């Protein structure tokens, strides 16, 4: 393998969770990046997103949501900063409209939004995880980010540690094409090479949902476990939809969560509804994210009623569709009376 282009070439078959757990590297090619520059960038975003931006440290990474006035998620972000810029990572398919909407509210704030997806420093994004990923990365990084949702900035790029999966750390490495050309052969020699869907499969098994075009305005943050993941700060000031998000938390009316399932149906995809066999006439939830599991089926994060999770008899698409096999989540689904 002589170049990073060859590393990013798509392998014929998706990786299995067993392969991911051992160690993998995969291109993350479907994510966009919004950059905000200017002295009021943090205060502007603080008034738009569900999480605290004003106190975001240089070594920190946070999840955050961007809601409609009705409290429904328009986007979810992975968010970090350097000395001058705040970055918001989100699916490329929704980046342009979300960036345009955010820009509408800048008004007189001293901040400028731009598309950083193709900037030289972020031209290549690789996802790594599994038991062998740490050792592979130690060839270039010392120390590695110490805990989930932390990062290090390095001459070779930005290394972000995200939520663990399969009992091992996972990382995103944002780098230039020149760096990728150097490191790709070594990574590919030590780790299983996956497609972008391998990264999404690892995200699903980490219990990290992401809003895509198919699921915009479908969920209040708590429905996809966002407050359990530290993505909602209930002490911060107002943002679009804040009153509804707070009411959902403290009045306990949602009674819904997102959980991990496996489905022996390759048609499972974000936005597809699911049905409880006990109540076949109306959907009990919706697929949030899905990825091939290397065994001919799909693993997915599915939002649904707590009663349906407890009954564990749910089908895809209709009450007669493919059954959902419920898997253990990597964190406790504390109902919080939702």
Predicted features and spans:
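Short, surface-exposed ligand-recognition loops at beta-strand->loop->(often short) alpha-helix junctions
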Residues: 35-41, 128-132, 262-269
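Glycine-rich, small/acidic residue-mixed loop/short-helix segments
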Residues: 224-231, 246-338
């Amino acid at each position: 393998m002589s170049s990073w282009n060859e590393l990013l070439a798509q392998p014929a078959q998706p990786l299995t969770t067993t392969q991911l757990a051992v160690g993998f590297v995969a291109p993350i090619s479907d994510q966009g990046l919004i950059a905000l520059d200017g002295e009021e960038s943090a205060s502007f975003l603080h008034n738009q997103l569900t999480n605290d931006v004003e106190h975001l440290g240089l070594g920190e990474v946070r999840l955050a949501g961007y809601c409609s006035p009705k409290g429904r998620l328009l986007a979810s972000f992975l968010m970090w900063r350097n000395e001058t810029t705040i970055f918001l990572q989100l699916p490329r398919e929704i980046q342009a409209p979300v960036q345009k909407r955010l820009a509408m509210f800048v008004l007189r704030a001293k901040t400028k939004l731009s598309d950083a997806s193709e900037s030289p420093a972020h031209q290549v994004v690789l996802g790594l995880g599994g038991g062998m990923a740490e050792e592979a990365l130690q060839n270039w990084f010392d120390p590695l980010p110490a805990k989930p949702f932390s990062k290090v900035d390095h001459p070779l790029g930005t290394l972000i540690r995200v939520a663990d999966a399969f009992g091992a750390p996972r990382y995103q490495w944002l780098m230039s094409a020149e760096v990728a050309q150097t490191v790709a052969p070594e990574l590919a020699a030590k780790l299983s090479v996956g497609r972008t869907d391998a990264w999404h499969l690892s995200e699903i098994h980490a219990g990290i949902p992401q809003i895509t075009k198919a699921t915009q305005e479908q969920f209040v943050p708590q429905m996809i476990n966002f407050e359990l993941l530290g993505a909602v700060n209930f002490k911060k000031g107002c943002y679009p939809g804040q009153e509804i998000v707070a009411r959902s938390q403290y009045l306990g009316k949602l009674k819904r969560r997102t959980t991990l399932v496996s489905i022996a149906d390759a048609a499972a995809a974000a936005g597809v509804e699911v049905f409880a066999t006990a109540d076949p006439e109306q959907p009990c939830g919706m697929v949030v994210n899905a990825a091939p599991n290397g065994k001919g089926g799909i693993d997915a994060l599915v939002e649904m009623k707590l009663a349906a999770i407890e009954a564990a008899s749910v089908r895809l698409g209709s009450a007669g569709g493919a059954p959902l096999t419920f898997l253990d989540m990597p964190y406790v689904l504390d109902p919080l009376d939702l």
